[in-house]
Amino acid sequence: MMQPSIKPADEHSAGDIIARIGSLTRMLRDSLRELGLDQAIAEAAEAIPDARDRLYYVVQMTAQAAERALNSVEASQPHQDQMEKSAKALTQRWDDWFADPIDLADARELVTDTRQFLADVPAHTSFTNAQLLEIMMAQDFQDLTGLVIKRMMDVIQEIERQLLMVLLENIPEQESRPKRENQSLLNGPQVDTSKVGVVASQDQVDDLLDSLGF
């Protein structure tokens, strides 16, 4: 099978694209320094780990609240099942008694069982109320996480503001005419500085551009 070959024109076009990207990157770096925005962006970037920690805190608090609520439901369920079962059994016995009155001894036993059921109900309901209160108290995480989320929104807005400043200050004059915005371009890549080949500082960016001849 014949391998596709790259025409000289294609090689020339690719070289032009790389050269333009390098030149634009260098221009952007120099403009950032002149405008003092490089430090502002660095400060915004430092806020990202803080936002990540806050997100983790929100996840933890939400998980803890969910676990507390589920534990309370599981603890209350047997008490509710027992009351339901006893109430249905007593109702059936009383219906049978009204349909066919039983002996006095059996009637006394039915009355005794009914009184015992009524005596047990407050204990079951008190336990259930305590679990319901626990479920309600578990929702207090919303106040804390609400503050955290608000702080995170402030961080995101600051990063957005800094990035928009960079874009507005570095748009070439010939390209400043109104045009349809491509919102997808606002989504920047995620950078993992622990990976090989990923630059992690401004000096490394400058060295990379110098090595490429820009």
Curated annotation (Swiss-Prot):
Domain of life: Bacteria
Gene3D superfamilies membership: Helix hairpin bin, Single helix bin
Keyword Hydrolase appears in the UniProt entry: yes
Physiological role: Plays an important role in bacterial chemotaxis signal transduction pathway by accelerating the dephosphorylation of phosphorylated CheY (CheY-P).
Pfam families: CheZ
Keyword annotations: Chemotaxis, Cytoplasm, Flagellar rotation, Hydrolase, Protein phosphatase
GO molecular function annotations of the record: phosphoprotein phosphatase activity
Protein's name according to its UniProt entry: Protein phosphatase CheZ
Bilayer-crossing regions: none
Entry's EC annotation: 3.1.3.-
Organism annotation: Shigella sonnei (strain Ss046)
Cited InterPro entries: Chemotax_Pase_CheZ, CheZ_family_phosphatases
GO biological process, one term: regulation of chemotaxis
GO cellular component, one term: cytoplasm
Family membership: Belongs to the CheZ family.
Entry's localization field: Cytoplasm
Subunit structure: Homodimer.
